[in-house]
Amino acid sequence: MGVNISGRSFLKLLDFSTEEIEYLLALSKNFKDMKRAGVPHRYLEGKNVVLLFQKTSTRTRCAFEVGAMDLGMGVTYLDPGSSQMGKKESIEDTARVLGRMYDGIEFRGFAQADVECLADNAGVPVWNGLTTEWHPTQMLADVLTIQENFNYQIKGRTVVFMGDCKNNVARSLMVVCAKLGMNYVACGPVDCMPGADVVDACTPIAAENGCTITLTQSVEEACTGADVIYTDVWVSMGEPDEVWEQRIAELEPYRVTSACMEMAKPEAIFLHCLPAFHDTNTTIGAEKAEQFGITEMEVTDEVFESKRSKVFDEAENRMHTIKAVMYAPLK
């Protein structure tokens, strides 16, 4: 393919060409095949990475840690209480220190400007594990899952995002669909539609790759003939508790139900980046059930637990795709 990502940071998918994204996906598949076959792939022995987390995580942290160790690298995890970044030491200075000690830096936090500042100053590749604006590593896992379920023929497929279409996952999903030639449909209330910045950036990319971007408030219009129906939590990390009541009122009509899946193609799949509020078996789920009288939020338990739900394949694929994201610039 002739793609070279050596030394590059992975901050948002708009920075990468279609060919580069396809290369990372092919690499991810290779790593998954090796992992499944028990074939060692410690190609980065002797290198070290640091994981900077301002926001808590299960999948992102585990995927980076296991992925790095599988590749033979040493890993340091720094949570907000373990580093002076942004408190006693600027992000610029932190980047310059860590860049002297580590071969790569992962950042999961709030501002996109922070991860870009790290990348500008570290002198080593920096990987965006999530910011308020973008979630690029999640997208590779999502697309690998779509590929696996549609015999790697994804061009022309239709991906629907239901709910808060302005969040980091929905924005990133629009980008990756446009880059890879999949039709993208954002379905939610007017106040939860994606911003003009991402729509304007993606529209010409989609046109170039022969696909479309659609914004709609109609669940029926969105779900009819869909190949993939995707949703995410209604309130994102870092948002105040006060928004719950408004979000539930706004987004309840956009819950993914069996009726939604029935409108989609017979082979359609359901995706969710997790964690999901599909029952009351969590502290927050139980609390909101008592407060608002709902036992399911963005997706029904029936859909979540159905054969069409590929959410745990998707979660596993975080590890294989993140491995590719680390390996490509460090090999």
Roles of regions detected by a PLM:
Residues 154, 178, 259-268, 306:
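Short, conserved loop/helix-junction motifs that constitute active-site signature segments
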Residues 289-331:
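C-terminal helix-to-coil terminal segments
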Residues 48-101:
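Active-site cofactor/substrate anionic-group-binding motifs, chiefly glycine-
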Residues 39, 103-176, 272:
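Anion-binding alpha/beta catalytic cores of soluble intermediary-metabolism enzymes, centered on
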